[in-house]
Every structure is written in C-alpha cells, then in structure tokens.
C-alpha cells in the first residue's frame, strides 16, 4: 500500500490522487506556500514539493524583477 508523502499514512484507492509520481490523499496535495488545495497535474513542483502555478511558484522560483517575467519585465538599453 503506497504512503502519502505529506502525512506518511497509507493511501487507499478511493482517496488517491496521483501527482509528482506519488500517491497523495486529496486534502494533503496542497501548495507548500499558500496551502491552496491542488489538482493532479494542475500545479508546479520544486524539489519534490507542490506549489500552485501562480502566484506562488512564479513568485518564488520564476524570473525576478518588475512584472516577474511578463512582457513588461524586459529592459531595453
């Protein structure tokens, strides 16, 4: 029986969500920063931990500076 990477308890088939190559309990698959409940495949990963794509992952690990990587973040010289 697989164990949830968050709570380390057994994950039964009826409550299983597979993401990041592991089986999670649905309530355990949350963003590490804001705590938002995530869906399988609807999030980003950093060092094996799930993060919501926006704003948490992009703010923490995306390009830094004004606009965080959007069209307005390029500086012309």
Curated annotation (Swiss-Prot):
Organism, as annotated: Rattus norvegicus
Gene3D superfamilies reported in the protein's UniProt record: Cysteine Rich Protein
GO biological process: cellular response to antibiotic; cellular response to UV-B; immune response; intrinsic apoptotic signaling pathway in response to DNA damage; prostate gland stromal morphogenesis; regulation of gene expression; response to zinc ion
Tree of life domain: Eukaryota
The keyword Metal-binding appears for this protein: yes
PANTHER family associated with the record: CYSTEINE-RICH PROTEIN 1, CYSTEINE-RICH PROTEIN CRIP FAMILY MEMBER
Protein name per UniProt: Cysteine-rich protein 1
Signal sequence segment: none
Gene: Crip1
Keywords annotated in UniProt: Acetylation, LIM domain, Metal-binding, Methylation, Zinc
UniProt-recorded Gene Ontology molecular function terms: peptide binding; zinc ion binding
Sites bearing N6-acetyllysine, chain numbering: 9, 22
Stretches assigned to the LIM zinc-binding domain: 2-63
Pfam family, one: LIM
SMART domains: LIM
Functional summary from the UniProt entry: Seems to have a role in zinc absorption and may function as an intracellular zinc transport protein.
PROSITE patterns xref list: LIM_DOMAIN_1, LIM_DOMAIN_2
Residues recorded as bearing Omega-N-methylarginine in the entry: 68
CC annotations in GO: cytoplasm
InterPro entries, per database record: Znf_LIM
């Amino acid at each position: 029986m697989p164990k949830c990477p968050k709570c380390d308890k057994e994950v039964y088939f009826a409550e299983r969500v597979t993401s990041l190559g592991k089986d999670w309990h649905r309530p355990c698959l949350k963003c590490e920063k804001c705590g938002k409940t995530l869906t399988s495949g609807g999030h980003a990963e950093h060092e094996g931990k799930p993060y919501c794509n926006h704003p948490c992952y992009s703010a923490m690990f995306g390009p830094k500076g004004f606009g965080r990587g959007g069209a307005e973040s390029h500086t012309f010289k």
